[in-house]
Structures are given as structure tokens and as C-alpha cells.
């Protein structure tokens, strides 16, 4: 199983990161004689521009040239952000629109991350693992191979306090919709966590747990194969 950043390394990374407030500015007006800072990315025509820049760089620019603008619309979706979204260019996985995956998360080959899922810094999505809609992998939460994390499920993150142990999900585990796995819990290979369960302690390999708090109710071997099947076709990428 892939191991990634320690809590201390993540804390240092966030502390040292240059905080960013990127904005997108739509402008109509007279742009004659305007000089744009090198940090600006400018697109458009003679009478209309779209500018990508930092909020701190926009302020002095606007103070200088604002009288030349007729219409202004500014989009801002974060403030003093320390962690950008992950560059997925070289990620060999299926990532659907609306998934939020932060830098320093690991997405292994053949994984699937569905709409609305959130993968925080330091989290690991194992090979062939599916993170279903609106599920959350908190900081440093780690899944093995061929895991299914159901819609709305939460694997608790542990960056603060840094002494806490991360959630570890071993290979071939099924986690039902809206289940919650608390920090420090390890779910053993081939286990099944029922929908809505709240897991507060380690789950033995090959067992089924359910309830609040979750308790072992039977063995995974007693569950019909069709109810615990991992479908390879859903993880298939282009040939």
C-alpha cells in the first residue's frame, strides 16, 4: 500500500506555501494606453477583456486604470488558499466533473473518482478503487486496491492534531453509502462496512460490520458474490 506525507510534512507544506487569491475579471471599456503587469493573463478584443490575476495585483491596476472601464465583473472562489487542486494531466484514472482533488493527493492507476467527491491533501486512492459521489477522503486517508467507497461516505482526515493516525482501508473493502470511518481506524482486507455505519474501531479482515457504533454482524464470505462484486468494466480506460 502506498504511503505518503506525514502530518508534519503536510503542516510544513501548508505553512510554507504562498497563499493565493486568484480572480477572474471581465471588463468592457477603453483599453488604449493600458500596460498590463507580467503576472496578468489577458484575453479578449479591443473593447472587452478577461483577466486572470491575483487579487493583490488587481487592486493597484484598478486604481490606475479603473476610470477607463465601463463594466466590471469579478469572480473569486477562494481566499488565501494554500493548496491548489491537483494537476491531473498525467493521472491514469477516471476522474468525473465536479470532483475536488487537492495537490499532494495520490490517485493510482485505474481508480475512479465520481462527481462531488473530495480527496484532501495527503490522501491516497488505491489502484482500481472507486470513490463514489460526494464521498470524502480526509487528509492522509488511504485506500488499498479495488476498494469501493460508497456515495456520501467519509474517511476522516488527520492533519490536526498531527499525532493522530490516518484511516487505512486495505484491499478489496466495500464501504456502504454514508458510512463514517473515524480517524485511526484500519479496515481489514475484504471487509464490508454497511451503509450508514459509524466505525470507531478496527474492522477485522473478511468481516461485515454495521450499526452505530459499528459491530461485526457476520463474515463477508456469507454475503452473496453479486452483492460485493467489483466491476472491472467501470474502471476501464481507453485502449
UniProtKB/Swiss-Prot annotation:
GO molecular function, one term: tetrahydrodipicolinate N-acetyltransferase activity
Enzyme superclass (EC): transferase
PROSITE patterns recorded: HEXAPEP_TRANSFERASES
Reactions mediated catalytically: (S)-2,3,4,5-tetrahydrodipicolinate + acetyl-CoA + H2O = L-2-acetamido-6-oxoheptanedioate + CoA
GO biological process entries: diaminopimelate biosynthetic process; lysine biosynthetic process via diaminopimelate
Cross-referenced Pfam families: DapH_N (PF08503), Hexapep (PF00132), Hexapep_2 (PF14602)
Keywords from the UniProt entry: Acyltransferase, Amino-acid biosynthesis, Diaminopimelate biosynthesis, Lysine biosynthesis, Repeat, Transferase
InterPro entries according to UniProt: DapH, DapH_N, Hexapep, Hexapep_transf_CS, Trans_hexapeptide_repeat, Trimer_LpxA-like_sf
Matches recorded under Gene3D superfamilies: Hexapeptide repeat proteins (2.160.10.10), Malonyl-CoA ACP transacylase, ACP-binding (3.30.70.250)
CDD domains in the cross-refs: LbH_THP_succinylT (cd03350)
HAMAP family, per the entry: DapH
NCBIfam families given in the database record: DapD_Ac
Function description: Catalyzes the transfer of an acetyl group from acetyl-CoA to tetrahydrodipicolinate.
Family under the similarity heading: Belongs to the transferase hexapeptide repeat family. DapH subfamily.
Name of this protein: 2,3,4,5-tetrahydropyridine-2,6-dicarboxylate N-acetyltransferase
Organism: Staphylococcus aureus (strain bovine RF122 / ET3-1)
Lineage: Bacteria, Bacillati, Bacillota, Bacilli, Bacillales
